[in-house]
């Protein structure tokens, strides 16, 4: 997806790191219907007919739900939209007494430390549910997490230079 790569590269030129980068990235993703649609196809290609509930959060969740709400209800056993601001420490609120699934996938625009996902997983666990996979458009985590699938992974495009074990041993 060259268009996504180009847009992320442009944001990185303007905002090399931190909250300004993620705010600009999130706004760009929410405003690009082609990226949202490609993301949904990416998710469907990875779950291949398995039935999960789906969780979305914040402005990204609202954008996905507004554009694809009916599609989400047709393809997932439960749809949960959670309040935003979670990466800034807000507590997620799930307005359900009973879940429609046990296993959920979490869809988000970006992933860095897992704060948003982990806070939702904590509340979901109190309702006997769990997040089994996280799907994101942009993964900026330094260490790849096996349960996070992304369309763009920063450290695959711009790897950190670490000395290999042979370099360390020869010092």
Model regions and ranges:
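Short, glycine/charge-rich flexible loops or terminal/linker lids adjacent to PRPP-binding catalytic cores
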Residues: 65-108, 112-121
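Active-site-facing substrate-recognition patch
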Residues: 1-48
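Alpha-helix N-cap/loop-to-helix initiation residues
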Residues: 62, 113, 141-142
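Structural motif
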Residues: 53-54, 103-105, 133
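Short glycine-rich anion-binding loops that position phosphate/pyrophosphate groups of nucleotides
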Residues: 60-62, 154
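Glycine-rich helix-loop-beta junction characteristic of Rossmann-like nucleotide cofactor-binding loops
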Residues: 45-50, 95-99
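Short glycine-rich phosphate-binding loop at a beta-alpha junction
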Residues: 50-60
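PRPP-dependent phosphoribosyltransferase catalytic core
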Residues: 3-20, 51, 119-171
């Amino acid at each position: 997806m060259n268009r996504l790569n180009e847009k992320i590269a442009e944001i990185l030129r303007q905002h090399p790191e931190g909250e300004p980068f993620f705010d600009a990235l999130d706004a760009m993703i929410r405003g690009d219907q082609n990226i949202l649609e490609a993301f949904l196809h990416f998710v469907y290609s990875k779950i291949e007919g398995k039935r999960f509930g789906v969780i979305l959060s914040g402005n990204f969740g609202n954008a996905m739900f507004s554009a694809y709400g009916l599609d989400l209800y047709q393809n997932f056993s439960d749809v949960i939209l959670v309040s935003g601001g979670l990466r800034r420490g807000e507590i997620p609120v799930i307005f359900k007494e009973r879940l429609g699934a046990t296993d959920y996938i979490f869809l988000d625009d970006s992933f860095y430390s897992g704060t948003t996902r982990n806070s939702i997983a904590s509340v979901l666990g109190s309702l006997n549910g769990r997040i089994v996979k996280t799907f994101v458009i942009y993964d900026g985590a330094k260490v790849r997490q096996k349960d996070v699938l992304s369309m763009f992974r920063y450290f695959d495009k711009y790897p950190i230079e670490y000395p290999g074990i042979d370099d360390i041993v020869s010092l």
